[in-house]
Structure formats: C-alpha cells, structure tokens
Amino acid sequence: MKLHQFLVFLFLFLSCFALSSWALPLCSDSRAPSEVNSTLSFCPYKGKTCCNTMKDTSLMKQFQAMNISDKGCASVVKSILCANCDPFSSDLFRDNSDQQSVPILCNSTSSANSTENFCSETWETCQNVSISGSLFAASLQGRAGAPSNKNASKLADLWQSKTDFCSAFGGASSNETVCFSGEPVALNDNDTTPDKPPSGICLEKIGNGSYLNMVPHPDGSNRAFFSTQPGIVFLAGIPDQDSGGVLDVDPSSPFVDMTDEIHFDTEFGMMGMAFHPKFAQNGRFFASFNCDKSKWPGCTGRCSCNSDVNCDPSKLTPDSGSQPCQYQTVIAEYTANSTSSDPSKAKNAKPTEVRRIFTMGLPFTSHHAGQILFGPDGYLYFMMGDGGGGADPYNFAQNKKSLLGKIMRLDVDNIPSASEISKMGLWGNYSIPKDNPFREDKELEPEIWAVGLRNPWRCSFDSSRPSYFMCADVGQDTYEEVDLISKGGNYGWRVYEGPDLFHPESSPGGNTSVKSLNPIFPVMGYNHSEVDSSGKSASITGGYFYRSETDPCIAGRYVYADLYGNGVWAGIETPANSGSFVTKRTTFSCASDSPMKCSDSPGTSGLSLGYVFSFGEDNNKDIYLLTSNGVYRVVRPSRCNLTCSKENSTARRNPGTSSSPSSSSSSCYKHINGFHGSLVVLFVSLSLILLGLLN
C-alpha cells in the first residue's frame, strides 16, 4: 500500500468517528430530565434536571460524609457530585460503569480544540486534601492508571501523578461529546437561527404498489422488504439514484404470504415487520398483525380489558358489531432458514410461525398501532395504541398495569421457560431487558418503555444518533405530535393532547391527576387546522431524520407527513443537541424525469400522494414515502428545478454502481460506541506502527 493511499484510508476511517453528535438532554439512567419547581437545595440546578429532592439530599449527605476541610477542594468536589443532576449527565457519564461516580472532566490535553482544563484544576486544588470515601479511588473508577495507595484519602497518595489522574478521568468536549468543566453544561447556542428551510422536496415514483412497511435488507445490499396491509411481504431490488430504474419486484412471487392468519380491513392487518439484526446469519424475522379469534383458532390471547386494569369486558359496548377482545394484536416469529442455507440469499420464506412472541386482545377496533422495530441496542420495540373507544374512556394510556397506550421493549433472544413465563405473567415468549425502566417496579408492567401515547404511528431511531428515538402520535381533536422518546417517559395522553390539557366527555375508567404527571411535551407537530380548515381530517405519519447525501438541503432534518397527503414537514434541532426543534411545512413535487408517471392532484397540476401510510429508509439512508398511489423516493432537488445551493451535481452517484451501505455515514456509525475515542487513539497508534513498517 502506498503511503498516500494509506493516509486517505486513515482519514476516511477516522471521519466515521466524527459524524455523530452524541449530546442530548438525557440523564445517566437514559431517562429524560424532569422539571423541578425551584432550585435544588444542595445542587445549583433548576428547571429541567436529572435530580429530584431525594437525590439532591442523598448527594448532600454523601458530600458531608467526605469531611473536606479545604474550601476550594470542597467546592470542586461538590460540583463534580452535582454533575449527576446535569440534564446532559448521560453524556457526562458516557463511559459509566455500575460503580463509576465521576463525570468526564474537561482536560485540554485531550484535544487541541478544548480550552478548559477542569481535570488539572481538580488535581491542583485537591491533591493534598484528605477526602473520606473519595470518588477518585481507582477501584471505583475502573479506568487506566494505577494508584500508589488504594486506601489513601488524598489524590497525591491515590494517584502517582496528575498525568495518570487525568488520563483516567479527563476528556474533551467536541461536536460529538461534552465534558464537565465545573459548571452546568451549556450548549453553544451563539447561533440559534436554523439553516434556511428547503425550497421543497423532490420526489420520483419508482413503484405502483401500496405498502404499509418497508425494511432495508439486513445484509446491507440495495434490497428491501415491503409488506402490504393484507399480509404479503415482497423482497424488492432498489434502483440506484439517477438510474431511471424502478423497484424490481415480482408480484407473483412474494417473499412470504401470511394472509391466512391475518384479519384485514381498514383498521386491521399486518401492521409491522422487523428483521433480526443478525438475520443474515440466523434468518429470524418478525411480523406484527391482527387476527380474529372468531375465525382462527390460533388467535388466542389474554384480553387487555381485565381485572388487573379495573376493566370488565362484559361492560364494554360492542364496537362496530365486534365483541371486546374479538380482535387480537400478535407478534410472531418466522424463519428464512427453511428455504435457504444462507438466509441473506433467501428469496422466500414459509408462513409457518416458529414462535408466538406476543398476543393480546383489543378492547375496541381502533388505535392499536402495531409497529415493531429493533433498536440499536438489539431489543424489539413494540408500539401500542390506547385501544380506541374515542378519547380513551378507560384511561388505558395512563393505567400503570395496562400495556395499551405504551411503547414496549422486549428481549426476543433470551426466551424463558413456559413456567417462568406463567410465573412472571408475560404475554408470550420473550424476556424483560434488565434495564427496562419498570422491571423492578411492582406498580407498572415490566415490558413498558414509555407511557401516555394515543396511537403512535411510525417511529424511528436516528441512524446517526441512537439516543434520538422519534415517534409520531396521532391526536384526538386538535393536535398531531412528534415525540422524542426516552426511557420511562410519560407523553401525557389523555391528560394532555399535544401541549394542551385534554378534557374527556366521559371517563368510566377514571382520570389521572395533572399534578401526578411529569409529562414530556412534543418536540414537533401541527394543528389540525393547518391541513384541514374544518379541523377534522388530520392524522400524522412519522418519518426519519434525513441522513442521505442525495438532498443536502434537508440533511439532518426530521421529515414527516400527514396521512391525507396534505402536508410534509421538515424539522431541525435548534440549537444542535438541545432536543428543541423548529419545524416548517414544505412543498413537494415530482421530478420531470420520474421513471413512473406521478399521480396528479385532481383539478391542479400538483402531485397527489394519496394517503401517506408510512415512510421507509434504505441502506443508503435514502427516504421513501409509502402511499396509496405508490412508492416515492426523495431525489436531488435540481430534478424538480428546486434551488439548493448545497447540491453538487458533480458528486452524483454513478448510475449502475452498486448501492453499498459502506458509503453511508451510518455504516461507520454501526461500529461506534461510548468509548469510540479510545478506539480512534488505538487505531492511530497501530497506524503509526504500520506506517513505519510500510516505509
């Protein structure tokens, strides 16, 4: 390998580690910061913080027990303890172990871009001060550096030098991470003006089929799975951008046909599908669908209206002629192994269930969502609506013992025995992840990840920032919302609809007190009146953060739409990493050279999308709209004569080249974790050695 070739490779490799922005207001336990009415009595935090009064008092007692006589050192140690309350504590403690209690201390020697050196200040202020039960003992820290005396109480006795101390506790602040400088983390918000909104979004039509779900093939190829609401899954080849091609799909040869088990009508059907992260090796995939127990003996599950949630099915009014829990929501596992020794090459699968993961009877005939997806953590997330009935009359979304109106998080890799499943009261063949927020809380169901949703319709993880888990939630009367989902978060329904209090006309299931909630309000959304003057026809469809290179003018924006095709929005976080978004409705149009003719809106020259059922994302991070009029893909703005100063026409993908996910920033991201900086340092060290060998 030539030296210049190696340097290019090294640069490209390292650039992977500088793509993602990690900071987000999030606590070290992955929960969202909560609002406190006044400044905490010990730690100087107010507003949204990661400490309540109990935690604040606990930190104060811990500090007092240290018995620090030097005022300067006491002030430093107090600030370090109180970093636990910082709204960005998840990032401050990003290398956290179960015992670690010290945030990453800003250390200017770690980065040429950092001007802070709080780590050195801590050493110089406290090195000769006795600290009982020191936070800085290496046995607690578990990082590099060997203490000279583990039983000592002074830093100078615990650590051999300032260099060793800051090697273990120091770090830098950058676009990707934050470090603790002795003060609450403050975002660089000198410029809070977002980039100019896009002049519009250009689409091309590449398929006529009407699909509800799209999942890119886990092998990273330019293929994707598309499923219809009746329950047929197709494996399709995706054409390169600018190639003039269309979806390569054979309607007569589906990947799998599940229609025999699925009950389909306007509200029911196959609502979601997910492929195991290791599908290319194990062939496992999952479907979420509805069944009718009056027509299929395999449709058996416990009713969600039961005594545990203070609900009596016999007292529910039949809905559209159906009986309570006649219809069930199901997650089932299937395999592609039976049709191919190499699952990544399988072109079809058998519709025979390998395992029933989850079954639950539905009280009414609407608001059951049903999307499933694997998160970056490898667990299966299951989105469930409030069960319907109009205004959630039984308040299921806030009921702690109900799984309705919740997002669930399940482990489908470690399946308990039948006796264990029965003992734990699970709804099927799965286990509970150890870090689920309510695993040890007897008042709430352990499957729950988040509560207070009405009908979450399409959620996604940002492929560049796994802590950004976005869900659109369909509103009742006035507001459609996008929520930034966090561990244990309560999103307000039906105490709130969007940011406003909601007042149900009747509530046989009781009410939840406003004062008992700590709601997390939407980060984006729109009023019904924005898309329909009558205020009635509106229903949000969640999308994705746009991470493709195709349209640089919407890069980094979260794109979502209204079901009725009346609007598409693009939201951008302002300032960066704040969790606050500015969103704007944008126009959409069809490329003049679209491979398939787009549908025109009656009486106009504009594009008619029909119903926007879902969004999709391929392995190149290009975004698709799955509509009743076909499959549309976001393409270069110039193909619609839209102005985008960032578009470089010379950097277009070459038609006919392989669409490899390795060209995508997210492919680099898959291999990055909390200690990515250490990996970079290691790689650089190895690179220097290799350069010496090459020369």
UniProtKB/Swiss-Prot annotation:
Pfam families: GSDH. Glycans are attached at residues 37, 67, 107, 113, 128, 151, 175, 190, 208, 337, 429, 511, 527, 641, 648. Its main location: membrane. Gene3D superfamilies: TolB, C-terminal domain. It is a lipid-anchor; GPI-anchor. One of its GO terms (cellular component) is plasma membrane. Its cofactor is pyrroloquinoline quinone. Belongs to the PQQ oxidoreductase GdhB family. This is HIPL1 protein. The keyword Repeat does not apply. GO terms for molecular function: oxidoreductase activity. Keywords: Cell membrane, Glycoprotein, GPI-anchor, Lipoprotein, Membrane, Oxidoreductase, PQQ, Signal. It is found in: Cell membrane. A lipid is attached at residue 665 (GPI-anchor amidated serine).
